[in-house]
Amino acid sequence: MTRKQKRLAVIGSGMGFLALAAALTFYALGQQTSYFYMPSDLLSQPAAAQERIRLGGLVQQGSVERGQGTHVSFVVADGQNGVPVVYDGILPDLFREEQGVVIEGRMGPDGVFVADTVLAKHDETYMPREVADRLKKDGLWQEQ
């Protein structure tokens, strides 16, 4: 091989490696995507079965029911609709009724959202902007 052919082979191999790395990165990021919904959005456009999503809204007054151990169920509402949620784990200290939450998990076949992560709103700084903006738009935002 001539010097020029070797250089072209190295450049071609390097570009192929970079293309493979980029493809694997985009594939991995696509697997981690979780779409954001408000309860009304989720009820009008149901998520695909077992699709990981984030649900945001307010914990509905009187809906929190504690079960055995760390099992808890509650309803996340946006003023128009509510979605029942079940969670098995330790809730954040700031979790309470009529407080903003963002939960991550999957919608069950029975219409109950099965959460694996619960994030409680402290203030707008700790809440995703889309949740805070939507709550303000719907007139449900509560200042601390």
Curated annotation (Swiss-Prot):
InterPro entries: CcmE, CcmE-like_sf, NA-bd_OB-fold. The chain crosses the membrane at residues 8-28. One of its GO terms (cellular component) is plasma membrane. One of its GO terms (molecular function) is heme binding. Residues 1-7 are cytoplasmic. It holds the Pfam family CcmE. GO terms for biological process: cytochrome complex assembly. Keywords: Cell inner membrane, Cell membrane, Cytochrome c-type biogenesis, Heme, Iron, Membrane, Metal-binding, Signal-anchor, Transmembrane, Transmembrane helix. It comes from the Bacteria. Heme binds at H122, Y126. It is a single-pass type II membrane protein. Belongs to the CcmE/CycJ family. NCBIfam families: PRK13254.1-1, PRK13254.1-5. Heme chaperone required for the biogenesis of c-type cytochromes. Transiently binds heme delivered by CcmC and transfers the heme to apo-cytochromes in a process facilitated by CcmF and CcmH. This is Cytochrome c-type biogenesis protein CcmE. It comes from Chelativorans sp. (strain BNC1).
